[in-house]
Amino acid sequence: MGRQASLTLDCSLFSGSIADIITAFNQIGWGYQGDIKEYLPLHDDDMFDYRADSISVGELLELINEKQACGELCGVVLYDQDSDRGIHLLAKDTKEITLNLMINRKTICGGFTDISWYIEHIAAGLEETGCIVQSLEYDEFI
């Protein structure tokens, strides 16, 4: 197994809605592969069996709202529209949003994650939209 890296954000001062956080990600250029949205379906019992469907952003956000209301883990795959990088966003609430940096993870020497790229392209971007990032935690497992 290769390296794994994740970034955990607390955006609860901005909103309690995970759908609002996903919308903020969309505003800073993190979106989807064409019309296809990859997400954890409703009542998936934490099986992590992502579904890839041609649904609208509105339909996806409705599903996220339903999952959050049911206390389920919400998950969506987002891609940086200016590169080939992608993340898995996972959250039950906006106090702990985990971003698995696993799709074409940006690296520096020795294969370490270029965390400054992710801070610049995610945390700083979110703050520019008014989404306050109250805390940020980074983990890398070798």
Residue ranges and their predicted role:
Residues 23-29, 48, 115-121:
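Generic alpha-helical propensity signal that fires on short helical segments
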Residues 33-68:
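Structured domain cores in non-transmembrane regions
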Residues 22-24, 52, 71:
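Alpha-helical protein-protein interaction elements
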Residues 11-14, 29, 50-53, 108-111, ...:
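Intrinsic-disorder-associated interaction segments
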Residues 1-44, 140-142:
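Short, extreme N-terminal segment that most often corresponds to the first beta-strand
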Residues 54-142:
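Charged interaction segments
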